[in-house]
């Protein structure tokens, strides 16, 4: 195992987010990453920021750091060796077994810990680590930056010239002339000119990643929350301090705007209320000077002021409030994992870690490829981009769907087709402060519905479908989208944000039909567990499959796992393991396991297995010592829908695990259902899944 030590060159360079972003980038290369913050950053008793987010967002198991007070006590008493021994013990605990690389984050530099630079160098040396320097372009000239990197590198460079893994530059302006910058840096720094300190990445400023939630602003200003609304999810992208008349300010009442006003500005309050009711998701309305609007105004605007619009009150006047807003702390609070997750993805996307990853891999060790969650998501998006498929979204004016389609179009994940009146889609986008990208296709169902009547009658002629019946059914946008898929005009369909599962699946069964060799349609969820991605099937479609159907589900799920790069070890689940139980339910699982082995002898499959015997190595060794699957299953096949759906939701909620899916299996062409509570990210990943499935379907047909 190799160790990387991340060290800052000065204060405020984004050390913690870079450390965790690097961890994510290396995980995408299927390296098993461990994380360590050896010494706590502050004297506060709360969990260190980087440790908290390593656990909560990066899903890395890491021990608590040595308290800063204890470290300083040891250093002041000449106990540096004792301190280093404790650090090494922590490193071994953090690395555990089988890790490819340990990322250790040093101490950030500040005016209190003047010793941090020297201590960081000693930590790196004692951990036998290669060092990644983290620096910033903020507030320095290229010449100053070159000198800073050269001096810092000398503190971590070993006598044989090794010890430097590279450097990362944060807070780069978007208009940076990269070529000129690197030329000047290399002209002044020997370690840069020689290549001893390679550049790992330049991370530009992204204002969206600095956006605090309305709740964060309320906490920082000690504001009274009059109406919480969606304060936990809305983000402040701009602040509007009302000093002018309303007609001169309405153009500022945009998505993410925080309206700061005295409570006696009834015109501003009513304008904010109207803006909210028209669909603009303002970040909030803040009354200054500890005041409240007149009762008549509150009554007039009651619908807006008691709904999802956050309403706050602060004791300071507007000028003082505006001044405090300018000086807010933009660090990510512990209860905002979504923002940190986006930040880590943003950083990982901008790090070139392929050469570094090659160095970190132990030569000559051929182990099974792991697929941690971040690598799964990354590869999902990359493969979808490569597929370049056209995906129809029948719920074309649903806000989450519109936002997901915009994101997919901008990132090149898929060529999305929204089925909805174009004007309505534009209104939905504007209400969310979004612009429709040029490549996003919008089709008005009213203008195309008629051309699908005859083809639909032909497809359903064996069922006696008439033209009037077809016309009536095509009023449903899901049916219309399914016909587009049946005729090959699109490559896949995603629906379910507002429609039921039956509304999505039924037209597919009638018009798309099952794939050759498939006797049924089933589903899987990709469970993004902290260590790896697991497959759960079927947790969405088949209520009580018989043995033959259960075997089909297992084979379909195994093939899906393989298609997405997940090692296939299938556990046929039951309430008993091996021969310990009996009864109709157990016999069904035994028979299904037998059928899978007969039909696909190359698959690693075993059952019946209890969930703990399938997933926990120690339990698997105890209950099924001869099983090739017990304790290390990756594909979990549930005996019925009740068990599968309950388990998936329990794991998802109790363990905070992201579940991607359900992904439908067994159809001739890909159709996927969404949960009606799906988030925008869920829809994006489902679109990506569908695009990849479309590639596989085309290959199977070809």
UniProtKB/Swiss-Prot annotation:
E.C. code: 2.3.1.8
Molecular functions per Gene Ontology: phosphate acetyltransferase activity
Catalytic activity: acetyl-CoA + phosphate = acetyl phosphate + CoA
Primary subcellular site in the record, as a coarse category: cytoplasm
One Pfam family from the record: AAA_26
GO cellular component: cytoplasm
UniProt record similarity statement: In the N-terminal section; belongs to the CobB/CobQ family.
Protein name per Swiss-Prot or TrEMBL: Phosphate acetyltransferase
Species whose genome carries this gene: Deinococcus radiodurans (strain ATCC 13939 / DSM 20539 / JCM 16871 / CCUG 27074 / LMG 4051 / NBRC 15346 / NCIMB 9279 / VKM B-1422 / R1)
Name of the gene: pta
């Amino acid at each position: 195992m190799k160790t990387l030590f991340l060290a800052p060159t000065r204060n405020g360079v984004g050390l913690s987010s870079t450390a965790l972003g690097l961890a994510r980038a290396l995980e995408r290369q299927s390296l098993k990453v461990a994380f360590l913050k050896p010494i706590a950053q502050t004297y506060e008793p709360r969990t260190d920021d980087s440790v908290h987010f390593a656990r909560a967002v990066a899903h890395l198991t890491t021990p608590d750091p040595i308290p800063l007070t204890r470290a300083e006590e040891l250093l002041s008493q000449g106990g540096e060796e004792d301190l280093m021994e404790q650090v090494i013990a922590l490193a071994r605990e953090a690395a555990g077994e089988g890790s490819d690389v340990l990322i250790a984050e040093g101490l950030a530099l500040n005016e209190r810990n003047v010793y941090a630079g020297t201590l960081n160098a000693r930590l790196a040396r004692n951990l036998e680590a290669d060092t990644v320097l983290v620096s910033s372009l903020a507030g320095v000239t290229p010449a100053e930056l070159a000198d800073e990197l050269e001096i810092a590198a000398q503190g971590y460079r070993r006598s044989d010239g090794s010890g430097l893994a590279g450097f990362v530059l944060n807070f780069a302006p978007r208009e940076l002339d990269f070529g000129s910058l690197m030329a000047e840096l290399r002209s002044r720094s020997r370690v840069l000119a020689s290549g001893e300190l390679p550049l790992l990445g330049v991370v530009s400023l992204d204002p969206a990643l600095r956006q605090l939630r309305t709740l964060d602003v309320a906490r920082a200003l000690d504001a009274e929350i009059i109406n919480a609304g969606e304060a936990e999810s809305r983000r402040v992208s701009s602040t509007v301090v009302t000093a002018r008349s309303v007609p001169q300010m309405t153009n500022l009442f945009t998505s993410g705007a925080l309206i700061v006003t005295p409570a006696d500005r009834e015109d501003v309050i009513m304008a904010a209320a109207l803006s909210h009711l028209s669909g603009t998701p303002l970040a909030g309305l803040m009354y200054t000077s500890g005041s409240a609007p007149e009762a008549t105004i509150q009554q007039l605007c009651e619908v807006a002021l008691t709904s999802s619009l956050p309403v706050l009150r602060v004791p300071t006047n507007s000028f003082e409030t505006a001044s405090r807003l300018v000086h807010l702390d933009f660090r990510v609070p512990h209860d905002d994992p979504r923002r940190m997750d986006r930040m880590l993805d943003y950083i990982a996307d901008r790090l070139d870690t392929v050469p570094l990853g090659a160095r970190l891999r132990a030569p000559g060790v051929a182990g099974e490829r792991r697929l941690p969650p971040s690598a799964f998501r990354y590869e999902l998006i990359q493969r979808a981009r490569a597929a370049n498929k056209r995906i129809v979204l029948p719920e074309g004016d649903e806000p989450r769907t519109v936002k997901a389609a915009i994101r997919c179009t901008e990132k090149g994940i898929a060529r999305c087709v929204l089925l909805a009146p174009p004007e309505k889609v534009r209104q939905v986008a504007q209400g969310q402060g979004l612009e429709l990208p040029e490549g996003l296709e919008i089709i008005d169902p009213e203008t195309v519905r008629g051309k699908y009547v005859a083809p639909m009658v032909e497809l359903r002629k064996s069922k006696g479908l008439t033209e009037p019946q077809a016309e009536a059914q095509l009023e449903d946008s899901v049916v219309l989208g399914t016909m587009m898929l049946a005729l090959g005009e699109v490559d896949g369909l995603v629906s379910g944000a507002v429609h039921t599962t039956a509304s999505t699946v039924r037209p597919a069964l009638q018009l798309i039909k099952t794939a050759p060799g498939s006797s049924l349609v089933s589903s899987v969820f990709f469970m993004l567990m902290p260590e790896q991605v697991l497959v759960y099937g079927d947790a969405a479609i088949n209520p009580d499959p018989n043995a033959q159907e259960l075997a089909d589900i297992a084979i379909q799920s195994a093939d899906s796992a393989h298609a997405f790069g997940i090692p296939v070890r299938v556990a046929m689940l039951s309430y008993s393991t091996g021969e310990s139980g009996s009864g109709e339910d157990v016999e069904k699982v035994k028979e299904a396991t037998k059928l899978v082995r007969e039909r696909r002898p190359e698959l690693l499959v075993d059952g019946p297995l209890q969930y703990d015997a399938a997933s926990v190595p120690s339990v698997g060794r105890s209950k099924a010592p001869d099983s090739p699957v017990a304790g290390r299953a990756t594909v979990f096949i549930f005996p019925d829908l009740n068990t599968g759906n309950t388990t998936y939701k329990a794991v998802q909620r109790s363990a905070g695990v992201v579940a991607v899916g359900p992904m439908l299996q067994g159809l001739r062409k890909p159709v996927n259902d969404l949960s009606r509570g799906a988030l925008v990210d869920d829809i994006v990943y489902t679109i990506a899944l569908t695009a990849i499935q479309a590639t596989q379907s085309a290959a199977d047909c070809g």
